Amino acid sequence: LYPGYLATYRRYVRVLQQKNALLRHSANGQERPYAEKRTLLEVLNTELAAQGEALQQRRREYLELLAPRACANYAELSHGAERMSIRYAAQFAPGGLAALLRQRQEEELRAGQSLCGIHREDLELLLDDQPARVYASQGQQRSVVLSLKMAEAAAAASITGEHPVLLLD
């Protein structure tokens, strides 16, 4: 829906894979000297921060478009029985990914894997301020998903000017 998003996402994933390979080898004590690993990790983190910030910004913009529609759809489906809300569960504030990556660098070296970034973020779907994945019934969960799908279709139509077809089973 957003031009350039897919290319940015692919760059992020490629750099993340390189970083995780370096961290795995570091945890096993393989290959490069420690100083060289640290320098390479800083370069990878700089690129991850740039791509991750751009992706998070697009995700937030899309959620601003999607959330009101999804919540209105749910209110209509449930006849106002519960209030749905959506929260972007971010690990960092906008502009804060580079600092978070620096802060967690030593921990990541010990763990042998990436511990933070946009790939670890998620949407939280809430019904009456309670997590829907835990507290909602199966029917409520289906209504939440249907509300989101309808909102996605409406958002896609407003962005592209073309109305998608929804196939519901």
Regions found by a protein language model. Name each.
Residues 1-22, 169:
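Extended, charged alpha-helical "arm/stalk" segments used for dimerization and assembly
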Residues 23-31:
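Secondary-structure edge/capping motif, primarily at the C-terminal ends of alpha-helices
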Residues 32-167:
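Conserved NTPase motor "head" modules and their coupling/switch loops across ABC/AAA+ ATPases, GTPases
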